[in-house]
A protein has these predicted regions:
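Bacterial N-terminal signal peptides
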Residues: 1-8
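Patatin-like phospholipase
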Residues: 12-53, 61-303
Length: 303
């Protein structure tokens, strides 16, 4: 009896800590997340929980499903982001600028060169949802995940944080990526959901509540364009104001983590950036993650 008791106490004392990863919002900056996951995987760091907000839910969801960062990297480097994720609605006529991508269209609006009727969103998100469906193969939270995973979205009516961990994974990701103004709010059950970055840009608390002992938070807020923003009309003023406000919220969310990965970068960030720029961001994610590995291993060994 004594030996059995000693054995169970010994096993409990040396149980490995649960490690969680919180992947933050950040649009085309998401290549950083790929670099982070590459290093964690190569270092043999097993993730027990993942949560993601906005584009972080996209990368986090694919990894929780596939647990194959090479497959994700291959997809991301060949991705035509404008085609699948930023295609304008068919009912919006772009007569003054002809055939164009959404980015150009949005730019023309911000410059005051084009008028639009008031809509719930410039894009309905169908092409994006179809692509995420294809990638995830209509997988569900309940049956298909290799790593426990949760997604953060924002309830547009109540302003509350909505944590999704049931149903089709692609629906949750699409809801979390529904940037207000760009996409029509995503109808989920009885809610109207939009981008989770409005309320929890780096979902550290969610990962902690899942059961993680050690939480790694990845913030993309310091990845910025290499040119100063042009502030010349009401749209650009509103956009910049929201950006500044969310920057502080991002810091508050990320700083709750035991380890924060917050790369600094100035360079091209458009959704149609060249492949070499994508690779540069991935490598930056790798470099910044390598810096925190000694601390992470120290924290792990302290349990």
């Amino acid at each position: 009896v004594f030996m059995l008791l000693y054995s169970s106490v010994s096993s409990f004392s040396y149980a490995a800590p649960k490690i969680g990863l919180a992947l933050g919002e950040g649009g085309s900056r998401f290549y950083i997340h790929i670099g982070v996951l590459k290093v964690l995987e190569s270092e043999g760091i097993k993730l027990d929980y993942i949560a993601g907000t906005s584009i972080g839910s996209f990368i986090g969801g694919l990894y929780a499903l596939w647990e194959d960062i090479d497959k994700i990297e291959k997809y991301a480097l060949s991705l035509d982001f404008d085609k699948y994720y930023l295609s304008p609605r068919e009912d919006i006529r772009l007569q003054s600028i002809g055939e164009t991508t959404f980015i150009t269209f949005y730019s023309e609006i911000s410059k005051g060169k084009i008028g639009i009727e008031l809509l719930k969103g410039l894009m309905d998100g169908k092409i994006m949802r179809d692509e995420i469906d294809r990638l995830t193969n209509w997988a569900s939270f309940e049956y298909d995940l290799k790593i426990p995973f949760k997604v953060v979205a924002t309830d547009l009516i109540t302003g509350e944080k909505v944590v999704i961990d049931q149903g089709r994974i692609s629906n949750a990701i699409a809801a979390s990526m529904s940037v207000p103004g760009m996409f029509i709010p995503f109808k989920f059950e009885d809610k109207m959901l939009v981008d989770g970055g409005l309320i929890d840009p780096v979902p550290v608390d969610v990962v902690r509540e899942m059961g993680a002992d050690i939480v790694i938070g990845v913030s993309l807020r310091d990845i910025q364009e290499d040119t100063l923003p042009v502030i010349n009309n009401v749209v650009s003023i509103l956009y910049r104001s929201v950006y500044i406000m969310l920057g502080e919220l991002n810091n508050i969310s990320a700083n709750k983590a035991d380890i924060v990965i917050r790369p600094h970068y100035r360079g091209p960030l458009s959704t149609d950036m060249e492949k070499e720029n994508k690779i540069q961001l991935i490598k930056l994610g790798e470099e910044e993650t390598k810096k925190i590995i000694p601390l992470l291993k120290t924290l792990i060994s302290s349990y």
